[in-house]
């Protein structure tokens, strides 16, 4: 039986999964972090780090919350730059995106539901 609580460190726990610490891709034996409902990422992005390719027809809702730095998100509808700690952007199903770290940045990404892309 898996444990229904967990305490950890996002940097350490996400190291093997590009920062992702919750989601369907976590083995159920690891307990509460295995979820089909939500995905959570602690993203550490050095200046110039980017996702040059656009997502394609993602059917999840996404929230990106800036912890530090400056981080640009390009959406099919617009582009936004998160500059101030606590700035965030959210978009729903069908909005494609790419991103770039304008300065060294840390962001928290939350997506739901958690499903293979």
Regions found by a protein language model. Give the residues of each.
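Short histidine-centered beta-strand/loop micro-motifs
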Residues: 31-34, 51-58, 75, 81, ...
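A short hydrophobic beta-strand segment most commonly corresponding to one strand
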Residues: 43, 88-90, 103-117
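Short acidic-glycine-tyrosine-enriched beta hairpin
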Residues: 77-94
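Short, conserved beta-strand element in jelly-roll/cupin
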Residues: 56-73
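A short, N-terminal "cap"/entry segment at the start of jelly-roll beta-barrel domains
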Residues: 1-47, 52-54
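A generic "binding-loop/recognition-motif" signal
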Residues: 59, 95, 103-104
